[in-house]
């Protein structure tokens, strides 16, 4: 089967191949051509959960996060734990069940289990870990999770069910590096239960012994924290001895973030800082904090250089100016941009995603005006009526008709039609008289009408 060959997972494969690719296709169809002697050409048309551009953004963001985690040279356990902690602390579950891709996870920070497991796969692969995506059932729900290899044994990981996206929640390890016995509520699909699969991926008979971090040592309520400039957050200790308490909090770089004697951190400027807590019994715990600017507080202006955008059936992707306070931001450095379909009259949408020293999302809208009415003509004449017609436009709300009684006269609104009607009969006219008409399309947008340009003047005379 060509498709299964294309998505076959290899331990030395790239992070965008194998299970990652398989978890991101949504549909496909196959066509074949046997017109040539002894040769058949198969053409696969694939539909994916994300676009090529979105996958480029995923690669960029994953590298940025992994660089900040700085575990490339660490042992397998430390790498797996760093990925687990980042994903479970920063990504929320999508209870609307609409977001499924790694893009939704790493960029939108909201996704269902498929996005959790595929992002886990990509990040672990980039760190050189052996990892697979597993599907099956969690209780009665269809579900996706991972297995990863530490030394010579494989362990179960479910970052979806360990996710604790709340300000004061600490990291959960209930589903991290577990054996099958402690993962009994996860029932694998049959292809992951065969003897050949089990032979290729031998599961450890015991869960990883140091997996529950907070049961082993004193720690802070966050092991890593992502903040925006101006944000405030409170640290506190986990697993303190009864006769011990935190004596001091210190920041490795107060220019990036300061911390009070009570553990309250204030984000000052972009950068990375380590917060260290020391107890009276000289126990230490740290949290790595990454501070960025909040892109949602930026301003989008000069869309299309303030030139009116007119419908032409093509997707509109106008230029823009993005500023944060007095600084002009650069696409590809400070933000990436995606556009809505923007093919019809009405409201166009732009979405910016923070990059580099910026994080968050900024949305902007612009107006797409109907195009100029064309194809205007007179289709019927009587002594007291004139019937006009014109070419329909896609996506408009209707058409307005204007009339003048001389070539230099003032045009007056005389009537309108809906978007479904491209004819209009002007009645009660004077016999053997010449009239002049203009037509324009309009689009209702909230409480506003967006008008297209007037058609050419249509001159007509009654009988």
Functional labels for PLM-detected ranges:
Residues 115-183:
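Hydrophobic/aromatic-rich core segments of domains that either
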Residues 50-105:
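Secondary-structure boundary elements
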Residues 400-431:
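Recognizes extended acidic, P/S/T-rich segments that occur
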Residues 153-219:
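His-Asp-centered catalytic microenvironments across diverse enzyme cores
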Residues 215-297, 308-310, 314-347, 353-366:
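Extracytoplasmic soluble-region selector
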Residues 426-447:
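Beta-strand-rich modules
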Residues 369-395, 431, 447-463:
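Pro/Thr/Ser/Gly-rich low-complexity, intrinsically disordered linker/stalk tracts
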